[in-house]
């Protein structure tokens, strides 16, 4: 038996102190409705009696809101079996932009009543809204189970294995929300001030190097050149003075003259691009955009990732001031992170790590401010991450990671088709990036050995000469390009994309791309022999990929994503499984 329920309260968790009502619909094992009701202004005994029912409770975001709120308000302690239709919505409908009951209600033709006042309306108004939410969610739950039966061929055990897995992930999200991190506000404000100052310095350096921004206007020959007495008019005198200044003859009818001259603006993409083109810029990074006519145009991009595009970095030797543009990109991003930290912090200076959904591999999509934070190795990354501190002396901030997780899961799949290469990768000291660099000709064997020798010295904190350090940095750039193809290749990156990312020529990027796939042909074989199917549900086709480790089906947008989806899904499942073992 299932009980689809919802509640209405006078606010969110941490604010609400009253539950207006609980509404529900009971379903039998065949999902037939066998009863419904509402509990206005429930007291503690009624709430506990409701949750003592022999049923599986179904709700939308109940793991992170409804049930925790019930525990807060009524002291509910018993554990209950649940199905959260929000988590299932994230899983089943990857193309939906929004997953709230309001959006699903539109699909089902059941409008969600709008209420903005959660304190002073009648109980009946809150009950009505709650009842309509239950109607929407009942339809959604029935649809979701029907869809899951198609995907999992009616295997109920596997369906509920998936549901329990999603439940655990949502419970992890709840734990994050229940344990907010504190922002070191004083240090954040200090860092923000320093970065703002650095931003001004970089902008000033760019302004000093950029061409001035000049605008022009057209001056036409005066219509009236002479007065009635035959003398030149004032306009005519000014015109003739202009012709003399410009070295033009009397036959001239119009002259283009300078209207204004201002310092260049680093914030103007048009001015920056004009400057770059004057320096010989050949763009390699583009963004497809539609114009008003619906035609798609590839627009050259100044930035790619954390900094400027590789094609602009090629111009650093010609115009060193462009390094300020690269740095300015990083500074602006870090300023944005700091401002978000400060704006999202509550009155205690704390922020929550919240989630916005699942990726197709069931990883979390994270909400700001704790999302896509720079690595400690990147510019201001250590300082930014250091701003997240424990809320008090009774807590400690800790984290966990698994070394080479995705590389290990990748080797698991590759082993079935190329055990020899996997055995090589498992040898201590093997560097897959150096391997690709050698095979592609990015590095010679002697350079590879020299890189390893100097790296060992640096790892052991032994002294190196200035010459060795210069050599290491040069070789490390070559290794970085090989590393790019190792990571990007597995996600289906084309030679053009590699050229754009690395700054290498397209012919060499093609060679690098071919080298990668010659070495990693087993990746294609894994993808080729993967288990896929396409479902038709509600008039929409959806590709699905089966993961033999997790035994889940993952939504798939493009066939080029088969291996990366398989690999990332396995890594996520392995990480969660080990977390469960630690907890148990």
Predicted regions and their residues:
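Conserved "right-hand" nucleotidyltransferase catalytic core of DNA-directed polymerases
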Residues: 2-4, 8, 112-115, 123-380, ...
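Active-site-proximal helix-loop-helix substrate-binding element of RNase H-like nuclease domains
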Residues: 13, 17-20, 24-44, 55-150, ...
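Short His-Asn-centered micro-motif
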Residues: 59-61, 268, 400
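Short acidic alpha-helix initiation/capping motifs at coil-to-helix transition points
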Residues: 61, 167-168, 266, 427, ...
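Conserved catalytic core of nucleic-acid polymerases
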Residues: 174, 199, 228, 232, ...
């Amino acid at each position: 038996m299932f009980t689809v329920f919802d509640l209405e309260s006078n606010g969110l968790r941490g604010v609400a102190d009253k539950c207006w009502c609980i509404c529900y619909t009971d379903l039998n094992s065949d999902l037939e409705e066998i009863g419904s009701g509402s509990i206005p202004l429930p007291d503690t005994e009624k709430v506990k009696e409701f949750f003592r029912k022999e049923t599986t409770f179904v709700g939308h975001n109940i793991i992170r809101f409804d049930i925790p709120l019930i525990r807060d308000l009524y002291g509910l302690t018993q554990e209950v079996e649940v199905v959260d239709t929000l988590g299932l919505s994230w899983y089943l409908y990857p193309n939906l932009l929004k997953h709230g009951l309001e959006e699903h209600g539109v699909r089902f033709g059941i409008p969600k009543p709008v209420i903005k006042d959660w304190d002073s309306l009648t109980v009946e108004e809150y009950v009505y809204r709650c009842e309509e939410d239950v109607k929407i969610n009942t339809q959604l739950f029935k649809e979701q189970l029907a869809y899951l039966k198609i995907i999992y061929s009616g295997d109920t055990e596997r369906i509920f294995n998936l549901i329990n897995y999603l439940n655990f992930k949502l419970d992890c999200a709840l734990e994050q929300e229940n344990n907010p991190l504190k922002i070191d506000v004083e240090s954040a404000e200090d860092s923000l001030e320093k970065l703002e100052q650095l931003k001004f310095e970089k902008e000033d350096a760019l302004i000093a190097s950029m061409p001035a921004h000049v605008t022009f206007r057209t001056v036409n020959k005066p219509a009236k050149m002479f007065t009635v007495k035959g003398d030149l008019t004032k306009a005519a005198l000014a015109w003739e003075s202009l012709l003399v200044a410009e070295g033009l003859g009397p036959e001239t009818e119009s002259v283009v003259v300078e209207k204004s001259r201002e310092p260049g603006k680093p914030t103007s993409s048009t001015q920056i691009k004009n400057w770059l083109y004057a320096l010989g810029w050949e763009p390699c990074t583009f963004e497809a955009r539609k114009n008003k006519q619906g035609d798609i145009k590839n627009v050259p991009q100044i930035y790619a990732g954390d900094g400027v595009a590789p094609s602009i970095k090629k111009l650093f030797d010609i115009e060193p001031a462009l390094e300020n543009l690269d740095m300015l990109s990083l500074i602006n991003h870090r300023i944005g992170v700091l401002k978000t930290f400060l704006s999202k912090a509550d009155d205690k200076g704390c922020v929550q790590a919240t989630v916005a959904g699942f990726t197709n591999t069931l990883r979390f999509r994270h909400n700001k401010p704790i999302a896509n934070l720079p690595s400690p190795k990147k510019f201001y990354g250590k300082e930014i991450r250091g701003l997240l501190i424990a809320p008090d002396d009774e807590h400690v901030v800790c984290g966990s990671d698994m070394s080479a997780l995705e590389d290990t899961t990748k080797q698991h799949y590759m082993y079935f088709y190329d055990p020899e290469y996997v055995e090589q990768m498992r040898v201590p000291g093997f560097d897959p990036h150096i391997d690709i660099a050698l095979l592609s000709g990015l590095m010679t064997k002697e350079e590879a050995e020299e890189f390893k020798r100097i790296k060992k010295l640096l790892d052991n904190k032994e002294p190196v000469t200035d010459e060795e350090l210069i050599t290491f940095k040069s070789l490390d750039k070559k290794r970085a390009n090989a590393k790019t193809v190792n990571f990007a290749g597995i996600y289906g990156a084309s030679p053009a994309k590699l050229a754009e990312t690395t700054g290498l020529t397209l012919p060499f990027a093609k060679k690098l791309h071919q080298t990668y796939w010659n070495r990693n042909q087993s990746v294609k074989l894994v993808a080729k022999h993967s288990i896929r199917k396409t479902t038709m549900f509600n008039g929409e086709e959806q590709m699905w990929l089966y993961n033999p480790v997790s035994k889940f089906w993952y939504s798939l947008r493009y066939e080029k994503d088969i291996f990366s989806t398989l690999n990332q899904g396995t890594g996520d499942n392995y990480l969660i499984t080990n977390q469960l073992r630690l907890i148990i």
